[in-house]
């Protein structure tokens, strides 16, 4: 697929003064516009002129209207966009952007004939604009904003959003339907064009710009031509079509169902003493055969059947990513539109390399819970691979979380783990609460008292640990919507259950009949909700005040990146009750 090339000029005003004070018979007798037409005729260039209303003693309201017809006839490739009222304009405060923008379109319409020439993507002066002001101009048809060519803050974006944008070159504010495209080439800063051309990644878009004051410089023009010449076979100027296509699957979704999916594998390349498979001696060295194809599972778990976008949590008894089938399954379910978390030990390099090649719009809805088996990783000399795979997933656009299963033998290594984590992950891991799975009450896996256990592991300041420990061993007697809002699913057999211990189940793979399982209600068969960090934070018990799921998974790194990308963080900031019906009692 071709990438796009977009060229724009900031601080425009002299362009319009020039055609006003000179006695040109055609717009393209102007040295400025003749250059633009040369680019268009040779490279099909589409060019945006980001203009002030007034600047350097000239106001665009005085622009001649004698070239109105030529502006109209060329408005498919020549656009005029708002840059600000003047060089002092900043829209981060109470400045009246609405008034300025209305004047701008009024004046441009007068001399350019109609509003088809107005660019609905703009680059505001100094990349300034708070949300209130951007929403004001959005009402006039503005779809998005071009952002800085460096790492500075852009408009109203939060730090995590800005970092994500600078890494992936595009970002969509899904709450407000506003697009952001990163500028990556400032022509006047290019010292050696040949060296710059070597650094251009043909797999990425070229969003280049210069300022009007440099346009008369032949060296600047030559660099622009060189870039167009270099990219003419790989990049097209279809800017708007690209944006709409790139963002079509990225939208504001609220969770419909939470489904904890069991992958029937009891094979693993690790042997951790605290693992429940180890506790119950259920290891099997053979990889499972899956009865149902990934395409069939997608159909069974379609958004239409389930009622909307779901969060699927994929967890194997052994290492989840060992079966090659899982890669195909992930891709199918992501293409269906669901969000997915995968539980993994993070050691299978090949699997992560395969996943990193997924389309970006799929990776944005994918997350990994990297189980941090520190001593096992160290024993197998896999720590370096573990870190590399985490960084690969983050760089690819996926989200992640790092989680330690605490056990008594690990306590003496806590300082070592913390030092390693801060150095390599930029933050401390989250801490879960391990259970003795072969006991009736599934008590905490420790010889310490609950108070001692809390004192030892709370030093990681994990919200996951504090919430999970607060609910551990607490029998739930409230009304629970598990069975209606959340499920347990065996991916191998297709058996869907209310919860881990349940009164009802249905095989949803054998037939595609509607799902008819009732809520657990007040008849929970478990001694306590030992996975409260998921089921209770998503809100299976609406009456219970619980944090959001993103708080169980996210961390802010020392470099201000976050473990959850903005899309996953937004999705995990909602509750099941927002998109499901509650019963009246």
Language model features with spans:
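Metal-dependent polysaccharide deacetylase catalytic core of the NodB/CE4 family, i.e.
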Residues: 46-133, 153, 208
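Accessory C-terminal segments flanking Radical SAM cores
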Residues: 440-585
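Canonical Radical SAM [4Fe-4S] cluster-binding loop centered on the CxxxCxxC motif
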Residues: 252-295
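Active-site beta->alpha N-cap acidic-glycine motif
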Residues: 1-73, 118, 208
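Active-site-adjacent pocket scaffolds in enzyme catalytic domains
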Residues: 60, 114-208, 217-222, 247-250
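Acidic (Asp/Glu)-rich catalytic clusters
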Residues: 34-45, 59-83, 196-202, 303-305, ...
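Core AdoMet radical
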Residues: 279-292, 308-322, 333-351, 361-385, ...
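Radical SAM enzyme [4Fe-4S]-AdoMet core and its adjacent flexible, acidic
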Residues: 373-492
């Amino acid at each position: 697929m071709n990438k796009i090339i977009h060229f724009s000029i900031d601080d425009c005003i002299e362009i319009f003064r020039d055609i006003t004070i000179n006695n040109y018979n055609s717009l393209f007798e102007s040295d400025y516009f003749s250059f633009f037409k040369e680019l268009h005729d040779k490279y099909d260039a589409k060019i945006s002129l980001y203009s002030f209303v007034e600047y350097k003693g000239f106001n665009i309201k005085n622009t001649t209207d004698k070239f109105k017809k030529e502006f109209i006839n060329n408005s498919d490739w020549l656009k005029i966009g708002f840059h600000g009222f003047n060089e002092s304009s900043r829209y981060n405060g109470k400045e009246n952007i609405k008034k300025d923008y209305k004047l701008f379109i009024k004046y441009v319409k007068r001399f350019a004939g109609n509003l088809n020439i107005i660019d609905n993507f703009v680059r505001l002066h100094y990349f300034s604009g708070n949300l209130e002001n951007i929403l004001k101009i959005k009402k006039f048809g503005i779809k998005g904003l071009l952002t800085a060519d460096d790492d500075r803050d852009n408009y109203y974006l939060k730090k995590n959003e800005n970092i994500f944008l600078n890494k992936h070159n595009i970002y969509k504010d899904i709450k407000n339907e506003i697009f952001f495209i990163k500028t990556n080439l400032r022509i006047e800063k290019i010292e050696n064009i040949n060296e710059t051309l070597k650094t251009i990644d043909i797999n990425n878009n070229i969003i280049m710009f210069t300022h009007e004051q440099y346009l008369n410089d032949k060296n600047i023009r030559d660099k622009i031509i060189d870039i167009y010449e270099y990219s003419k076979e790989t990049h097209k100027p279809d800017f708007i079509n690209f944006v709409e296509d790139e963002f079509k699957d990225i939208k504001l979704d609220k969770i419909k169902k939470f489904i904890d999916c069991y992958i029937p594998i009891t094979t693993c390349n690790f042997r951790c003493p605290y693992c429940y498979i180890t506790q119950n001696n259920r290891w099997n060295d053979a990889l499972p055969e899956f009865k149902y194809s990934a395409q069939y599972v997608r159909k069974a778990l379609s958004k239409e059947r389930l009622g909307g976008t779901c969060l699927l949590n994929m967890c194997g008894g052994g290492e989840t990513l060992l079966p090659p089938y899982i890669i195909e399954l992930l891709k199918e379910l992501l293409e269906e539109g669901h969000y997915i978390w995968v539980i993994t030990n993070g050691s299978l390099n090949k699997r992560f390399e395969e996943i990193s090649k997924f389309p970006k719009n799929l990776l944005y809805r994918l997350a990994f819970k990297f189980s941090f088996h520190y001593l096992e990783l160290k024993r197998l000399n896999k720590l370096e691979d573990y870190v590399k795979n985490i960084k690969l997933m983050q760089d690819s656009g996926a989200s992640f979380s790092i989680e330690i299963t605490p056990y008594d033998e690990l306590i003496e290594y806590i300082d070592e783990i913390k030092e390693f984590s801060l150095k390599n992950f930029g933050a401390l891991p989250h801490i879960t609460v391990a259970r003795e799975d072969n006991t009736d009450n599934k008590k905490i896996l420790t010889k310490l008292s609950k108070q001692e256990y809390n004192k030892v592991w709370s030093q990681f300041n994990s919200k996951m640990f504090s919430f999970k420990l607060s609910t551990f061993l607490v029998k739930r007697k409230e009304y629970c919507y598990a069975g209606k809002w959340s499920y347990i699913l065996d991916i191998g057999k297709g058996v869907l259950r209310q919860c881990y211990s349940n009164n009802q189940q249905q095989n949803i793979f054998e037939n595609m009949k509607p799902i008819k399982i009732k809520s657990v209600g007040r008849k929970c068969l478990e001694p306590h909700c030992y996975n409260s960090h998921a089921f209770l934070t998503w809100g299976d018990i609406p009456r219970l005040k619980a944090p959001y799921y993103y708080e169980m998974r996210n961390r802010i790194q020392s470099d201000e990146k976050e473990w959850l990308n903005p899309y996953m963080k937004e999705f995990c900031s909602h509750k099941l009750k927002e998109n499901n019906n509650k019963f009246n009692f």
